[in-house]
Amino acid sequence: MAVMPPPNSVNGSERRYLEDGIWQHGRFYGSWKPGKYLFPIDSEELNRLDIFHKVFLLARDNKPFQAPIQRKAPRMMDIGTGTGIWPINVAEECFTDAQIMAVDLNQILPALIPPGVLPKQYDIEEPTWDSLYTDCDFIHMRMLLGSIQTDLWPQVYRNIFEHLAPGIGHLEHIEVDWTPRCDDDERPANSAFEKWAELFFDGMDRFNRIARVVPQETRQLLEATGFTDVKQEMIRAYVCPWSSDRQEREIARWFNIGLSHSLESLSLKPLVEKLGWKPEDVRKLCTTAKRETCVLRFHTYCNIYVWTARKPGPPQ
């Protein structure tokens, strides 16, 4: 039986998806197929997902996607849609006649959405996607590492391939590499952020849900699936706005906010349930890491990876 937070702690829209949730480690998690999705679905997490939508827009010239779309009324899918901010953005500003299926294990979209956006509760780890759109012009997915069983990634890519339109169907996949990096000596000694990342990756490995970005393996997997025109883009995101470059500073401001929200959300379950940490100790580590990532003299950054690919074949 789900334990609800105090009545005055949630508003009406939140209560719509929290009523069937599970209260664990001080956060709210989805209860449909429990254990499949290891991250919260509470208001703080929804804010985090929307913040990263802004990060990705800033990092990509304010474009929600870059693939060429040939049909005027395209059919699209957003896999792991979260709050639905991406399909809503596309439907309102790019293709008002598009049909966009917003697919997720948890239905946490807002009540008011554009008419072309179709919410779909679905487990993308299923062997086949029989009830999802086919003949798609575009399939979008982002920040799904850690959400998919490690050995099921080839199957997920095969299903995406099968649901794209031959010749004109494109995939775009975006991930954040949470590995802290620094190209100079301006890095903290005994970094709490580095410790957090190592523990997070370890815990997720023990769940058999890899969270590490391995760029070459992803590219090879896309090519092995049958995709052509496979391209990989890497975008640097500093964890605080120290850079003299205006765009880098703006990306860093938003990435810092998103990272601050991510530390606890991502690491609570893996550290508590697989590494034996207490929730309060996880929060202490996250607080220390947050403080570290706000120090301007530290030049730490993370990489954002974007893979794009096309399904070959004559258009039908």
UniProtKB/Swiss-Prot annotation:
Enzyme class: transferase
Keyword Coiled coil set for record: no
Alphabetically ordered keywords of this record: Cytoplasm, Methyltransferase, Nucleus, S-adenosyl-L-methionine, Sporulation, Transcription, Transcription regulation, Transferase, Virulence
Pfam family, one: Methyltransf_23
CDD domains per the UniProt record, alphabetical: AdoMet_MTases (cd02440)
Entry GO CC: cytoplasm; nucleus
Primary role: Methyltransferase that performs automethylation. No other methyl-accepting substrate has been identified yet. Component of the velvet transcription factor complex that acts as a global regulator for secondary metabolite gene expression. Controls the expression of the mycotoxins trichothecenes and zearalenon gene clusters. Negatively controls perithecial induction, but positively controls virulence toward the host plant.
Name of protein: Secondary metabolism regulator laeA
Organism: Gibberella zeae (strain ATCC MYA-4620 / CBS 123657 / FGSC 9075 / NRRL 31084 / PH-1)
